[in-house]
Regions:
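Generic secondary-structure signature for well-ordered alpha-helical cores
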Residues: 25-32, 98-105, 140-144, 175-190
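Cysteine-cluster motifs in flexible loop/terminal segments that predominantly coordinate metals
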Residues: 42-72, 204-210
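Helix-loop-strand module that forms the ligand-binding subsite of alpha/beta enzymes
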Residues: 60-151
């Protein structure tokens, strides 16, 4: 079992990374492999609505999004992390997730289907709950079980050293990791018992005015 931990911060070893690192340590204790995927600090284009992904089965913009999607095929679960920028996720992680999830949708890929997911947010002070809500939208649109902790998944601090003082925030990260590991074991056991996946329905697409 392996969980991909996506760092949506431009800082590879900053506050968001510190939260993901706490998750990674706990997953290791639970005998679950993980990998921290850095989206980096280079500009990431938003979706240009070209529709090429439906034919190419990957994004037409060949960058870190396609690198992630290759890894995602083999991953069993996902945790995305973002610092708060103006009470929302960063522009980079928003563009990244827009394109990754839209590519999976348009290419009819099962890369995210019924794989557990969660997000964490990092801020000096506020905006975490709005960011948390924003990032969870991707999972609920993709039939992904959302893993929760004992509080909204947020850490606070203006530096990694500050985050390490946020004892409750770090505990939230550990509880989240254990809940993710437990769900993965439950899913694995269900598959071994031959419990079938839910019946799929063809997607209906309607406009609100019709």
């Amino acid at each position: 079992m392996k969980v991909l931990l996506v760092n949506g911060s431009p800082h590879s070893k900053g506050c968001t990374y510190t939260g993901l690192l706490e998750i990674q340590k706990t997953l290791k204790e639970e005998h679950v492999d993980s990998e921290i995927f850095q989206i980096g600090n280079k500009p990431i284009s938003g979706c240009i609505a070209c529709g090429a992904c439906s034919k190419l089965k990957k994004c037409a913009i060949n960058d870190t999004v396609n690198e992630f999607l290759k890894l995602a095929k083999e991953a069993d679960g996902f945790i995305f992390g973002s610092p708060v920028h103006y009470a929302g996720a960063t522009g980079a992680i928003t563009s990244f997730m827009d394109r990754a999830f839209f590519t999976a949708l348009c290419s009819n890929s099962d890369v995210f289907y019924l794989k557990p997911a969660a997000c964490i947010t990092s801020a000096r002070r506020a905006g975490t709950t709005a960011t948390f809500d924003q990032m969870n939208k991707y999972f609920s649109l993709s039939e992904m079980p959302i893993i929760s902790s004992r509080y909204w998944n947020m850490i606070h601090g203006n530096s990694p050293e500050d985050v390490k003082k946020d004892l409750e925030g770090l505990q939230i990260m550990r509880v989240l990791a254990r809940n993710m590991a437990w769900f993965l074991r439950c899913k694995e056991a269900a598959i071994e018992l031959g419990i079938a996946y839910p019946k799929k329905e063809a997607r209906e697409r309607t406009n609100f005015i019709q």
